[in-house]
Structures are given as C-alpha cells and as structure tokens.
C-alpha cells in the first residue's frame, strides 16, 4: 500500500433507539459528568459510564446519544454513544438531529 492512499472503513451510523435522545455537550462538569442540551429541549446532567470513561474522550460541542434515567428523566441521563463529525452531519441530513 502506498503512502498517500488510506483505506477508510465504512460502518453504519448508530441511530437513536427507543428511549434514547441525541444531544450536544454544552459543558464539562468534571468527575465524568457533562451538561447536555437534548433534542427534546431539556438540559440534562449526563453521566459517562465507567466502560466509556477511559476509552472515549468527549469534548464540548460533541454530539452524543443520551438515555434519560427512569426517575428524574428531565434532569439526568447516561451517555450511551459519541458521534464523530461525519456521523453527526449524516444524522442532521437524515433528520435525526434537530438542534
């Protein structure tokens, strides 16, 4: 393989499932917590689960997928997925992301 050619892996974009809402990270609070503006209009305190903490780095402005808690569903949620720039552009074009 020559130096100038890179192969790109084609993979499917994870779409929101039942009970999951896309959102944009507004602020990093520390200790694995984020302030997320969700597509349904609520601002939730998002928690990064332990299995994602060390593997995925989340910054302000990133598009994430959150799953609201059973109780306090309008205030708190768990972060389920972080989208890349190209994935978030695709979601916006297809109408999944309305922010």
Curated annotation (Swiss-Prot):
Provide this UniProt record's keywords sorted from A to Z: Initiation factor, Protein biosynthesis
For this chain, the annotated S-S bridges are none
Q: Which GO terms describe its molecular function?
A: RNA binding; translation initiation factor activity
| Gene3D superfamilies hit by this protein | Nucleic acid-binding proteins (2.40.50.140)
Q: Which CDD domains match?
A: S1_IF1A
Q: Which SMART domains match?
A: eIF1a
Top-level taxon of origin: Archaea
Q: Name one Pfam family in it.
A: eIF-1a
All residue ranges annotated as the S1-like domain in the record: 11-84
Q: What does this protein do?
A: Seems to be required for maximal rate of protein biosynthesis. Enhances ribosome dissociation into subunits and stabilizes the binding of the initiator Met-tRNA(I) to 40 S ribosomal subunits.
Q: PANTHER family in the record, alphabetically?
A: EIF-1A
Q: Which NCBIfam families match?
A: eIF-1A, PRK04012.1-3, PRK04012.1-5
Q: Which family does it belong to?
A: Belongs to the eIF-1A family.
Q: What protein am I looking at?
A: Translation initiation factor 1A
What species is this protein from?
Answer: Methanothermobacter thermautotrophicus (strain ATCC 29096 / DSM 1053 / JCM 10044 / NBRC 100330 / Delta H)
What's the gene? eIF1A
